[in-house]
C-alpha cells in the first residue's frame, strides 16, 4: 500500500496518477476484508469500492479532457 501511494504522489503523469490511485484500492479492500468487523466487512468493502470508483470517474474525465486540449 505504501509503495502504491508513493508512486501515486510522485508520478509526473496524470494518467499514471489515476492508475496508481485506482490500484491503491486493492490493498485497502484487502485490509477491510481481513481486519474489519465480521458482519459488516463485506458490505463495507463493496460500498468503499463503489463510491471510490464512482467518485473518481469525474477525475478520469477531466484528465482525458486536458490531454485532448493540451495536444
Curated annotation (Swiss-Prot):
Gene name, Swiss-Prot/TrEMBL: ND4
Protein name: NADH-ubiquinone oxidoreductase chain 4
Bilayer topology: Multi-pass membrane protein
Record keyword Heme present: no
Keywords, ordered alphabetically: Electron transport, Membrane, Mitochondrion, NAD, Respiratory chain, Translocase, Transmembrane, Transmembrane helix, Transport, Ubiquinone
InterPro entries for this protein: NADH_UbQ_OxRdtase (IPR003918), ND/Mrp_TM (IPR001750)
Uppermost EC category: translocase
Keyword Cell membrane annotated: no
UniProt-recorded Gene Ontology molecular function terms: NADH dehydrogenase (ubiquinone) activity; ubiquinone binding
The enzyme's E.C. designation: 7.1.1.2
Amino acid at each position: 500500500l505504501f509503495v502504491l501511494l508513493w508512486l501515486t504522489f510522485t508520478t509526473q503523469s496524470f494518467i499514471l496518477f489515476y492508475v496508481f490511485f485506482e490500484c491503491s484500492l486493492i490493498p485497502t479492500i484487502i485490509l477491510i476484508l481481513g481486519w474489519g468487523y465480521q458482519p459488516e466487512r463485506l458490505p463495507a468493502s463493496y460500498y468503499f469500492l463503489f463510491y471510490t470508483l464512482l467518485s473518481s470517474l469525474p477525475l478520469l474525465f477531466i484528465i482525458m479532457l486536458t490531454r485532448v486540449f493540451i495536444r
